[in-house]
Amino acid sequence: MQPLLSVNDLSIGFGKNPPIVERLNFTVHAGETLALVGESGSGKTLSCRSILRILPSTAQIRSGQILLNNRGNSLDLAKLSERQLRDVRGDRVTMIFQEPMSSLSPLHRIGDQVSEVLKLHRDCSQSIAKRQVLKEFEYVGFNDPERTYNAYPFELSGGMQQRAMIAMATVAKPELLIADEPTTALDMTTQAQVLGLLKKLQAESGMALILITHDLGVVANMADQVVVMNRGRVMESGASELVLGSPAHPYTKKLFKAVPVISDSIQPALRQDTADIILSLRDVSKTYAIRQGNALSPNYSIQAVNAVDLDVPRGKVVAIVGESGSGKSTCARIALGAESSDHPGQVFFKESPGTDAIEVQSLDPSRRADFQRKAQMVFQDPHSSLSPRMQIIDTLTEPLDIHNIGTLAERRDRAIELLEQVGLNPSMLRRYPHAFSGGQRQRLSIARALALRPQLLVCDEPTSALDVSVQAQVLDLLEDIRDRLQLSYLFISHDLAVVARIADEVAVMRRGRIVEQAPPEVLLANPKHPYTQALIAAHPKPDIHRPIDLDTVALGAGEPDTWPDAFRYTVGNAPPLKEIDTNHLVRTHA
């Protein structure tokens, strides 16, 4: 059978430089899923953008063919005019981009943006287009299609924005859908639901799917064929059973080795030593007042955090796990004193064993500055947390300058020491952030957090923006400096596999409350709460024989008033956290 799409000897370059993508070959048949796998910079996105000829202005297709089956004849997309391409883009071949918020116009309603596809390619009226769009919205899982049609992008969550992008890409019933990292920015349960939706759409429409991803777990759940890329070249390709089951190339093996996994084995939990607690949150809550845009509408409030109690033992890693909006980052900011807790919440910090704990919320400015030297934060996105206008030496010495620590020579020596601590060369001091890779920038963020010799690091999703192998390197670094410098971590994440590797204790949050808490070897092997079970079930494993359990995900990912009776609650009647076993707490009525 003739393939729907054939890419033959494709090479892409910028200007007169050597090619970025070199001699790429793959085919996709109708109804088939091909996964392009690789780390950032491997050329997978550039390759797929070339199919639709939406490359950057300085990039050129140097050689090769991109053949689309046109009723038995081959149409070379690389040679079509711009006018001819308009009949292909958005109609026969469509694309879902990685960041839905940057792909959707903030100035236009969702429904109008999706309707535009039908007006361009089906020449239909506004009323017919709206009817078809509402039907598509219902199909992709919107509970209220009419409301979604009239909404602006900022009014939708990340998962809902991605569903809107899927609706836009599929409303014209394309033959080929290209999905560029469609779940990278999403939480685990939302990711599982989006992957399930793509499989459903594909099964019912027969469209082909090219999936661009760096996640081998996603590949195992979706792909029929796999192409592994590195630095613009194909390292390995073949059926997913072969590539995932017995990878042959060293690079593919390296990717597999770096994948964090959740163990199935249950180990008995030991009673934690609670004598030396460096950080303690007691009855911490946070309510935000939301102003309505319409002056006639009443304001309302959102409780982001609700009565959280949490201890971080000295020298240990305590992780808070949950989806976006669960309250975990708000807890982190309150722990550092960047936000205040609602009354009567308190945050206690003990500088050393045997000393009295200080209450962070009530510190005066001078004592707060002293506390901030001892508790620092590593942020999620190293790109936005490092000033593009400052050389690295200035970035690393700025905290020392603010706190009037050391002479200029001593600060420079400290900057060199910090680079060496995080595995970077001191010769990089005069570079700017843009000269570093994502993993190197995160190392720089960690180095800056260490500048004041803190005792506590709050790490807010420090690996979520990184490729899997770079993620493993950053986790290695965090473990190394924890042991060498005797640090304590409050670690924020949505990825249970990452947490399983680094944490001594895990607290799972949902809608502002801790619903389950235990050491990772207990929590991940023997979860009791339906939400914890959903998070674990939603984690894609790089094993084609262990697909995502969408039923378990749907059960636990719902609202608290839809959970099983033992765990169900509404706003005012949440059950308490109960110790059901040694160091294993569950919020349950039972």
What residue ranges belong to the model's regions?
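ABC ATPase NBD Q-loop/coupling interface
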Residues: 65-87, 125, 196, 346-370, ...
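Conserved ABC ATPase signature
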Residues: 151-156, 160, 432-436, 440
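ABC ATPase "signature
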Residues: 234-238, 246, 514-518
